[in-house]
A protein has these predicted regions:
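Rossmann-fold dinucleotide-binding core
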Residues: 55, 78, 82-157
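Rossmann-fold NAD(P) dinucleotide-binding segment
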Residues: 36-97
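Helical "substrate-binding/catalytic lid" subdomain
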Residues: 148-246
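Hydrophobic beta-strand scaffold residues
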Residues: 16, 32, 96-98, 136, ...
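A generic structural signal for well-ordered alpha-helical segments
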Residues: 9, 25-27, 90, 129, ...
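NAD(P)+-binding Rossmann beta1-loop-alpha1 motif at the extreme N-terminus of oxidoreductases
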Residues: 1-42, 65, 69
């Protein structure tokens, strides 16, 4: 996702500096920093696109580089409580925090994928990302509100994807895969393309999505809502992250 945003922002005329501790390719026109702190220094806007588990550590590593002129946008799938905690840390620097939720696979929508944002930095994030073609809903609430909406959506989408995958694998084992696919497609407005997307994307992004679903289950539990299906989806995603194959 970071690569996608960096490419789009560079193409839109913005000066982009990025950091990735892994071997990810550096998009053309993007300056690659040696550290997150270096990448953030002097930036007008910071986009954090890591796994949710490291979001607090990332924030702590760059606090010294933030200024009151900086918008710090966290686009991870951390829980609402974590987003509020991150906002409090960022607030100590005078920077404006934005809790930003990505609604859909960026492999399909790219930088134009729909977003929800909340917090003091939300209007600026909405302005910049809308210029990239995204539809951005800037909520009036505090940080954590956007992530809460995404996790509520995930309580539908991630279990749905897992159930679809399970049904297709079962149909395959029974020699009736095409029939099962037709049954699923007839019930979903996305049709056959959505089924294929579930089958490929669920395995490809299993590790990251398992963290998101864990956060979703925790959020539902905090609301006093039973979350057996969400928890079961987490177990499925963790299995797929290890095995890398359906069935």
């Amino acid at each position: 996702a970071g690569n996608i945003y960096a490419t789009a922002l560079t193409g839109a005329g913005h000066e982009v500096t990025g950091f990735d501790p892994g071997p990810a390719d550096t998009p053309e026109g993007v300056r690659r920093a040696e550290s997150a702190h270096e990448a953030v220094a002097g930036a007008e806007m910071v986009l954090v696109l890591t796994s949710a588990s490291v979001a607090p550590a990332v924030a702590d590593s760059v606090l010294g580089a933030l200024t009151p002129d900086t918008v710090y946008a966290d686009l991870t799938s951390a829980t609402p409580d974590v987003m509020r905690s991150l906002s409090a840390r960022v607030h100590t620097t005078g920077a404006r925090f934005a809790d930003v939720a990505i609604l859909g696979p960026m492999t399909i929508g790219g930088a134009a994928t729909d977003l929800i944002a909340s917090g003091p930095g939300a209007p600026e994030v909405a302005r910049v990302c809308a210029s990239l073609g995204a539809e951005v809903e800037a909520l009036p609430g505090e940080p954590g509100e956007a992530t809460a909406r995404k996790l509520l959506r995930s309580s539908l989408m991630k279990p749905l994807a897992s159930v679809v995958c399970e049904a297709v694998v079962a149909g395959r084992a029974a020699g009736a895969e095409e029939w099962v696919r037709e049954q699923i497609a007839s019930q979903l407005t996305g049709g056959a393309e959505l089924v294929d997307r579930f089958l490929s994307g669920t395995v490809k992004h299993a590790s990251r999505r398992s963290e998101e679903v864990r956060a979703t289950a925790d959020f539902l539990a905090s609301l006093g809502v039973p979350n057996e299906m969400t928890t079961a989806s987490e177990l499925t995603l963790r299995r797929l992250a290890v095995n890398g194959v359906q069935g």
